[in-house]
Design a protein with these regions (language model features):
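Non-catalytic, solvent-exposed segments at the cell envelope interface
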Residues: 1-284
Length: 284
């Protein structure tokens, strides 16, 4: 069942209580992106996640950590035999299955989720007036079946919502999905810096209200505002990002991003996300 985020009123600029609301403990949020226009999937086929990221807010150290999870990551999905790709978890069991699969992979508790389709992404970027970004190379891709043409030039660009969506979804180069994950990280940091530099945090609830048709979450209004306030107070210099370490693996005839327990722990250690240690797991 689709659950839209709670309707929120735009808080008046004089409402210091709302503006001062902050998190008092770490929370981990699983961010999932769904592409309803993905031509890789049949119209009646369950949707797979097009992007997955763990956002960890630590009010103790005033830091935010973002860990990108390649959609082809080789995982075991609860209740299924053998190996699957991480992006299949949502198709098999919805948000709860995706949360459990990521929690098992990382040995990290997932407190909340935010599921966004690309329409919401485009709307948010347009609402903040677009994002300035240095595009690392020319990008061109054409998919007539999806009525999609990506044509972004190398150099400094001002990306509106549509072109920003094309930038973060482009994967037709030598790095494939891994290159796309790297671009998503780069773009998110640039967009976050712009969003949370908006003069007043009271615009954040308005963003949620505007895109609520395209967003599903189990966070309540106050928690969303606290997370937004914390992000604004931390500043983009306190945002650390990384990608799940691993390597390409096609030994079984399927292209996976294979990772090990050691690589998972290294990924989390480098950006400061705590996880369950192996000895703690054994004691239980």
């Amino acid at each position: 069942k689709r659950v839209a985020p709670p309707k929120v009123d735009v808080v008046g600029a004089s409402d210091k209580i709302t503006q001062n609301e902050k998190l008092n403990k770490r929370i981990n949020i699983l961010l999932l992106g769904i592409d309803d226009g993905d031509s890789d999937a049949a119209p009646d086929e369950p949707k797979r996640t097009d992007a997955m990221m763990l956002a960890s807010f630590d009010p103790g150290d005033n830091k935010v950590a973002l860990l990108s999870l390649p959609r082809d990551t080789k995982v075991q999905i609860p209740g299924r035999a053998g190996w699957d790709k991480l992006n299949a978890a949502y198709a098999y069991g919805g948000v709860m299955m995706a949360k459990q699969t990521v929690a098992n992979l990382l040995q990290v508790p997932i407190h909340y989720y935010v599921l966004v389709d690309w329409r919401a992404f485009i709307d948010v970027i347009d609402l903040i007036g677009g994002v300035d970004l240095y595009v690392e190379k020319d990008m061109y891709y054409e998919d007539p079946y999806a009525d999609l043409v990506i044509d972004i030039k190398h150099g400094y660009q001002h990306l509106d919502g549509k072109r920003a969506g094309e930038y973060v979804r482009f994967r037709k180069d030598e790095l494939g999905d891994i290159g796309r994950v790297q671009r998503q990280q780069k773009f998110m940091k640039a967009a976050a810096a712009q969003i949370f530099n908006i003069d007043t945090v009271t615009k954040i609830p308005a963003l949620f209200s505007t895109v609520d048709r395209h967003v599903e979450t189990d966070m309540n209004t106050l928690t969303m505002i606290k997370a937004a306030n914390s992000f604004k107070l931390f500043g983009d210099e306190k945002v650390k990002s990384g990608m799940l370490y691993g390597n390409f693996d096609d030994t079984e005839g399927i292209s996976y991003w294979a990772t090990s327990r050691e690589e998972v722990q290294k990924s989390l250690d480098e950006i400061g996300i705590p996880y369950m240690k192996d000895d703690e797991d054994e004691q239980e």
